[in-house]
Amino acid sequence: MRFAPNRLLTSVALAVVMAGGVTTVTTATASATPRVNVCGSSYTYLESFPIRSGTGTTVGDIDLYWSAQSERNCAVARPVNGLTPHWIAVEISTPSGGYASDGLSENYTQYAGPVSVYAPGCVSVFGSMGYGGPYGYGQGDANNVAC
């Protein structure tokens, strides 16, 4: 299981509770989960696609990378805004049938992936994560990107 506790978020929440009178904390005040290239040194970051909850709140990102050396795209799904999901999954595919996934039967809480496919053309990516409370389930995708 991949897990990194967010002590800053815990400290902020504790401070708010101790201050009294404030009953809600928005995710916008929490620090973003950093994007880290776990695909490898030959991969270059291309772009990110949001993973949103049913209420439209962005709860994660799917980061897409490219390696010109191997002609492969790589995807990683990660939470944002200091949130910690119960699970994370990521998938990547090509129009020609290339496919890879990670986290579908796991309980990752920091990130899912890296997953990569040989893709001299376009790829599609899908990411999802499960939360308790108000966020429930989040998903996001991007079709025919990095062409």
Predicted stretch roles:
Residues 31-147:
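Post-signal peptide N-terminal regions of Sec-secreted extracellular proteins
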Residues 1-44:
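N-terminal prepro-regions of secreted/extracellular proteins
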